[in-house]
Amino acid sequence: MKLPILIYADFMKCDDENRHPLVCQGTIKDLAENNIILGEGMKLVFYNEDEDENGNRDDLVVEGIIEYDKVNKRYAARIIWEDIKNISKLSAEESVKLGFR
């Protein structure tokens, strides 16, 4: 399976506009390790570690669109929260869209 660049996200954090602020240490680390310079409108794939019912790793993933939060002077990802899925549950179309195929 081809793997896209995955950026860590703590899906429990969101700002007043229901966006994911890109401030977690894991997020900052992944952005730096992949030499990603954030910009408005950029699309990235975010993940959070998860497991299936047998204890096997099966991360949660979702696409986010980068926006600059002018009030807090930081970047945030606009995520469709209902689209968060375990990798094993992605349809073929979703796998292609997120870069897994």
Question: For the regions a protein language model found, what residue spans apply to each?
Answer:
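Short, charged beta-turn/beta-strand-edge "cap" motif at the junction between a beta-strand
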Residues: N48-N54
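Short alpha-helix capping/helix-loop boundary micro-motifs
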Residues: V23-I36
